[in-house]
């Protein structure tokens, strides 16, 4: 008992879905979405998380240094060759090598 494939150009009968939402859609058609729990229930923040707000009095003196801006680095006093001086040196080397060969 072998089935013959349909002729070329004929769409199968089960190719397109039925009109309307799927049968297993959530929520079922005609019913609203369930109410969400907002605002969060009492007892928030959850156990294990500290409450939000200002730090307690004396917080910086508990062994941690107070944070601030890092110290600025002083500019180097040595004069390093600039890009222009490097390009001139490379051009001179090119001219010398071109004249030699």
Swiss-Prot record:
Q: Which organism is it from?
A: Arabidopsis thaliana
What segments bear the compositional bias annotation Pro residues?
24-43
Segments traversing the membrane = 78-95
Pfam families attached to this UniProt entry: CYSTM
Q: Where in the cell is it found?
A: Membrane
Q: Which UniProt keywords apply?
A: Membrane, Transmembrane, Transmembrane helix
Q: Which family does it belong to?
A: Belongs to the CYSTM1 family.
Q: Name one GO cellular component term.
A: membrane
Instruction: Cite the record's Low complexity compositional bias ranges.
Output: 59-77
Protein name in UniProt? Cysteine-rich and transmembrane domain-containing protein B
């Amino acid at each position: 008992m072998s089935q013959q494939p349909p002729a070329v150009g004929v769409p199968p009968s089960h190719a397109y879905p039925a009109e309307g939402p799927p049968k297993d859609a959530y929520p079922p058609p005609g019913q609203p979405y369930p109410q969400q729990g907002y605002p969060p229930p009492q007892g928030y923040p959850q156990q294990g998380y500290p409450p939000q707000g200002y730090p307690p009095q004396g917080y910086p003196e508990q062994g941690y240094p107070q944070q601030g801006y890092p110290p600025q680095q002083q500019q180097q006093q040595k004069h390093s060759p600039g890009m222009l001086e490097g390009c001139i040196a490379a051009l001179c080397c090119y001219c010398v090598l071109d004249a030699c060969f």
